[in-house]
Amino acid sequence: MSGFLLASCDAPVSEGQHTKYVMVIHGGAGTINKESMTPEKEQAYKEALTEALQAGYDQIKEGRASLDAVQSAINVMENSPLFNAGKGAVFTHDGKNELDASIMDGATLKAGAVAGVTNLKNPINAARAVMDKSEHVMMVGRGAEIFAAANGCDTVPPSYFFTQERWDQLQRMISQEETGHAAFNDIDPKSSSISGVSGKDKKFGTVGAVALDKSGNLAAGTSTGGMTNKKYGRVGDAPIIGAGTYCNNATAGISSTGWGEFYIREVAANRLSSLMELKGLSVDDAARRVIDEIGKMGGNGGIIALDKAGNVGMEFNTPGMYRGMIDENGKVSIFIYKE
């Protein structure tokens, strides 16, 4: 496997040359500044993103479906405390971890999602189970947990999700609220759902993946722990088909990351697909348009997309987004900061 390529996503390509990418992933967007990132943490992110890409690529290389590749890549990120999904999920206001995920098949438009689950190790696996083994698209809370466990998804005790960094973030935000220095919708400069970041845009974080298999089928998935200090059963865009995740072989596979309320209002993932289908935009132009529209609404975050020809769109309006892609030959490209 190749080393890290820290070059711009928009690096020039020789005339007539086309690199076909088979997977693109993200690990959250936010104020990710090189000045606030230690070399050790930066390396840890690069290694985790590369491991996720490799896991997905291995599925594709072996001839498995793009859905399997997406699930495998997201499993790696869910199992890492670095990302706000699975093991690294943030805490709600009452000190719990409530996780959301969704997955979609571009060939059939079938989809599955779970929201507000508290004891499932890998929520993306539960979303896949909902898609494959039920007549439903979304299941929530205890019902989703019972269904997922009955269909082979691993369960864990609540203590599995505890990380000191996430707990400390919650305590800082609660302290600010109690002293009147922060309301729920304020951004706490010291609290982050995205490890290794500083400044604004820090309550949220998500992981996502889009894959293109040997049969030419696309799949997309997204998983998250939501917003730090979220309250009262809040659900963001990650499990919402059309907002956090959308996939259609006719256009692209898409996964979002950012302030979920804005992505729901924009119906961001479907908006990107519609711009390609109805306006004839390329995948990267459509991604750029969606992020521009979200920015004008007052939202921030990023989006990744992959079309059937292996073209990638990666756009964000924050200083950084953990992201990467791998081409059909297994060449890995990893990016963190705005290039």
What are these regions (language model features)?
Residues 1-2:
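Sec-dependent N-terminal signal peptides
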Residues 5-8:
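C-terminal motif of bacterial Sec signal peptides marking the signal peptidase cleavage site
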